[in-house]
Amino acid sequence: NGYSHIPKMFFRPIKISRDDIGKRDTFTLDEYDEMVKFLRTYTAKKLCPDEEQRTERQKVRDYILTLSNTLMRTGELRQLTWADVLGYEDRVDMTGNKVCLVQLRIRKETSKVRRTRIIWVRGGEYIKRLKTYSSFTEPTDLLFTNRTGTHPLGTRELYRHWDVVMKGIGIEDHSERKLSFYSLRHFGITMRMKSGVPIADVASVAGTSVSHIETHYRHIDDDVMKETGLRNFAPVKEGEEAFG
């Protein structure tokens, strides 16, 4: 009947209230750029010759980059299987840069809001790259697995690497700032809002409500409107449009 049997599901208790996403600290754009640069070094063969350890680092790297690009919740991404990767499409964005979009299915069984959603998002290149070095790529396999492929990549392993990455980019107070993997979703939403993506579109991709975005990201929406408003103050010469 078109339904798939998922043989195993893994859920861990969480203590994140629905309001936390708007209150959590996130990264500045400079900090995020530093993290991307650090991850290149962190996964380099020269600095990590042990293949098994390097593979784990690569998974953590692509887990980080996928979270920030897809706006997924950590639990949703950890439950994503290769059968949920529905397709890719190479496009050129509004700035002229080539991007690889990926279509993903977040199943209701793994979603916090218990609704299936299918989204097109950036970050397809990271998922493609993951498939080149992962030993577990069957349709029912999880994208981000532990070393044996039997469970999701462990929380202990993830945060062991997270601590190294945060210190590596000079954020010693990441615990005090409450920077976690979940902050990457917050960062992704923030960047989409600052880029002027309509709230309804951001909410749809993130799997949350428009009212939730409006409530907890209203300050960002206000900033965007202010920036748009300021563009009216540029001198307008005859024959030119007010918005340059």
Question: Where are the regions a protein language model picked out?
Answer:
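Short, basic (Lys/Arg/His-rich) helix/loop patches that form interaction surfaces
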Residues: T41-R54, T70, S135-L142, T150-H151, ...
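Conserved tyrosine-mediated DNA breakage-rejoining catalytic core shared by Y-recombinases
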Residues: F11-P13, D19, E31, F38-R40, ...
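Key DNA-contact positions within bacterial/archaeal DNA-binding proteins
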Residues: G75, R156, S211
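C-terminal catalytic core of Y-nucleophile DNA break-rejoin enzymes
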Residues: I21, T28, T110-K131, T140-V164, ...
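Catalytic-site neighborhood detector that most strongly recognizes the C-terminal catalytic loop/helix
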Residues: T26, K98-V99, K108-K112, A206-L230
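Basic, Lys/Arg- and aromatic-enriched nucleic-acid-binding interface segment
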Residues: H5-T74, R78
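Short regulatory "switch" loops immediately downstream of catalytic or recognition motifs
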Residues: E34-C48, R61, A83-V92, T145-N146, ...
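C-terminal secondary-structure termini that scaffold catalytic or DNA-interacting sites
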Residues: T41-A44, E51, Y88-D90, T95-K98, ...
